[in-house]
Amino acid sequence: MEEYYMNTAIELARRGEGQTQPNPLVGAVVVKKRQIVGMGAHLQYGEAHAEVHAINMAGSLAKGADLYVTLEPCSHYGKTPPCAELIMKSGIKRVFIAVEDPNPLVAGKGITMLEEAGIEVKTGLLRQQAEELNKMFLHFMRTGLPYVTLKAAASLDGKTATETGDSKWITSEAARLDAQQYRKSHQRILVGAGTVKADNPSLTCRLPDAVKQPVRVILDTKLTVPETANVLTDGAAPTWIFTAAGSDVRKKDRLTALGIKVFTLETDRIHIPEVLSILAENGIMSVYVEGGASVHGSFVKAGCFDELHFYFAPILIGGTLAPSLISGEGFQSMKDVPHLQFTQITQIGPDIKLTAIPKDGKDGDDVYRNR
């Protein structure tokens, strides 16, 4: 039954997906005499935490009850008071925590507060599932870098468009809808200037339940993106541009006047680790990279990705000049290429979605998540 209660808390936490960052996804359940008497989830950044909703719902029944929570309760004052204090005041006798919070503001302090108050604390229940739930938050807190997901759609022979650039549409509507879920769950959508010039995308989440739009990030070495592009003019979401030293200063001023945030790097090329460091400094914990091929190649070459989503359609495009999934410098030796482990293979309509994470190809250790 303990696993059932924690799984219920995990499912509750999912309701806040795409709405709580930079906060984690958290769900909580209050149980008394084997009955759920309170439940809650953190649904939006700045609003009440899961434990608050669950304990308030339980009311007086919280006294002597058990609390199941997906992440260690906070112990500090932020936008809301510390949940650990509320738990102590409520009379909860036992707390089951799936994962400890690596945030330096918490990092075991919540557990210590509860234990010093005489509350029994047990950790690790459904740890793996809870880690997966909050992989972006946990990765950011542990490494100081955003969680990076690479996404691409291609024909079965790995082509993302025909030789003429025609790419609408390679994959089915069902596959494109699936990708929208990840636009919702990531804080930033990133593409290169070539994608903007070729497709003029809006790069927004079109799901009806999307509470807020991810900020659009454009990598544009020479600041060549058209000033009439949708991402600069539609007002649907903020847009950030990373450009290299020597790019057009007057154009930068015009873009800034439009409300576009422009980051000018000190080098004549855009280095992916530097981009991620700047994003991290701005509190960004997740990035959804949608290409194009040279951008994907840069992330792969730099070893700067944590997950990969490739959608393959049952079509063949061919053509020597037709663009492929990944371009750029590539690798000169097989001993240097990144090895991946498939975590999921799913059929979505007529298409196949491959989900993978980087591995070193030897002992199964994840080489990029701890970079």
Curated annotation (Swiss-Prot):
Substrate binds at S167, R183, L203, R206, E290. Pathway: Cofactor biosynthesis; riboflavin biosynthesis; 5-amino-6-(D-ribitylamino)uracil from GTP: step 2/4; Cofactor biosynthesis; riboflavin biosynthesis; 5-amino-6-(D-ribitylamino)uracil from GTP: step 3/4. It catalyses: 2,5-diamino-6-hydroxy-4-(5-phosphoribosylamino)-pyrimidine + H2O + H(+) = 5-amino-6-(5-phospho-D-ribosylamino)uracil + NH4(+); 5-amino-6-(5-phospho-D-ribitylamino)uracil + NADP(+) = 5-amino-6-(5-phospho-D-ribosylamino)uracil + NADPH + H(+). Zn(2+) binds at H49, C74, C83. Binds 1 zinc ion. Its EC number is 3.5.4.26, 1.1.1.193. GO terms for molecular function: 5-amino-6-(5-phosphoribosylamino)uracil reductase activity; diaminohydroxyphosphoribosylaminopyrimidine deaminase activity; NADP binding; zinc ion binding. It comes from the Bacteria. Keywords: Hydrolase, Metal-binding, Multifunctional enzyme, NADP, Oxidoreductase, Riboflavin biosynthesis, Zinc. Its cofactor is Zn(2+). GO terms for biological process: riboflavin biosynthetic process. The active site is at E51. NADP(+) binds at A153, W169, T195, D199, T221, G292, A293, S294, V295, H296, G297, S298. Residues 1-144 are annotated as: Deaminase. Residues 145-371 are annotated as: Reductase. InterPro entries: APOBEC/CMP_deaminase_Zn-bd (IPR016192), CMP_dCMP_dom (IPR002125), Cytidine_deaminase-like (IPR016193), DHFR-like_dom_sf (IPR024072), Eubact_RibD (IPR004794), RibD_C (IPR011549), RibDG_C (IPR002734), Riboflavin_Biosynth_HTPR (IPR050765). Residues 1-122 form the CMP/dCMP-type deaminase domain. Converts 2,5-diamino-6-(ribosylamino)-4(3h)-pyrimidinone 5'-phosphate into 5-amino-6-(ribosylamino)-2,4(1h,3h)-pyrimidinedione 5'-phosphate. In the N-terminal section; belongs to the cytidine and deoxycytidylate deaminase family. In the C-terminal section; belongs to the HTP reductase family. This is Riboflavin biosynthesis protein RibD. It comes from Bacillus amyloliquefaciens (Bacillus velezensis). The gene is ribD.
